Amino acid sequence: MSTLQRWMMGAGMLAVACPNVLSAEKATSPNIIFILCDDMGYGDLGCYGQKYIHTPNLDRMAQEGMLFTQAYAGSPVSAPSRASLMTGQHSGHGHVRGNKEYWPQAPTMKYGDNTEWTVVGQEPYDPQHIILPEIMKKNGYTTGMFGKWAGGYEGSCSTPDKRSIDEFYGYICQFQAHLYYPNFLNRYSTSKGDTATIRVVMDQNINYPMFGDDYKKRTQYSAEMIHQEALAWLDKQDGSQPFYGFFTYTLPHAELAQPNDSILQSYKKKFFVDKTWGGSEGSRYNAVVHTHAEFAGMITRLDQYVGEVLAKLKEKGLDENTIVIFSSDNGPHEEGGADPEFFGRDGKL
């Protein structure tokens, strides 16, 4: 047994828990890291039969920990599925029933020459219904969330600063989270003295348009920025207080965009250009040539992030008392040129 106990659950869920967590001799509350990715099919991972995409870290979690083969998402779309996890409610009883966005009625503002809404986000979680971070906080945990929120629009009754999250960095709005080179991200940090959830402008990105060839000149890649914030938060944990980390990484949904590094290059050499994507300006999805290589690269990049989280826990000496859980919010998507049938990403009902 590895020092962590990993659990993977169906639609791709996996977890690892340390031996100390299972020991009656120790009353120490375990640390918990829940990594929830976005729109990954269970068939995207090698441990669930994927043959073309490299996922060594998640495959190792499955081998050394617990692999689930029967599990169900709360909903086929993002916000209500995440609400089911946060509230413990069936989506038929929960307050959040869909991906309803509030920004269409909001005034607009400019970031460079790019237009954005002054308010973005989804239906708020019911403030009278306790959610998972609040439960953890009441039980003595410090809490950090990095990635997608989708539990309330900016300035609403349900934003990270109002729901017992000590540190947040990522996207308030699930629609904004479809883009990897955004105009802004959101942050709430008690350590930085924030009193509310704020916007953090991507100063380099806003010099270039959201749609067209110049979009590729943007360099502030949100997936990496969010991951680095998560690692920095984890690096601050010293074992004196139990921690709950909710890493809601946006990979592999939705636009097929990422740095043209060794991960992507390896898949460009592996896959022919047999399917392209023309783009959709209304959705702000740009044209993609290497659709299959781009998607495969996003899965391997996510796997690399998971491996770095596990390595950080070991480096800090926290792996002996930490549970790590990995899952997806729901099944695969087709937006932005994704091709779930090509990779056999899920089964058909």
Predicted segment positions?
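Active-site-proximal cap/lid insertion segments
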Residues: 27-30, 37-53, 60, 67-69, ...
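Short, structured coil segments at secondary-structure junctions
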Residues: 161-164, 345
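A structural signal for short, well-ordered beta-strand segments and their strand-loop junctions
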Residues: 144-146, 246
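Bacterial Sec-dependent signal peptides at the C-terminal "C-region" and cleavage site
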Residues: 15-28
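Bacterial N-terminal signal peptides that target proteins for export
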Residues: 1-11, 18-19
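Conserved beta-strand->loop/alpha-helix structural units within folded catalytic cores of enzymes
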Residues: 37-39, 135, 139, 146-148, ...
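Active-site segment of extracytoplasmic enzymes that catalyze sulfate/phosphate-ester chemistry
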Residues: 23-24, 42-131, 135-141, 155, ...
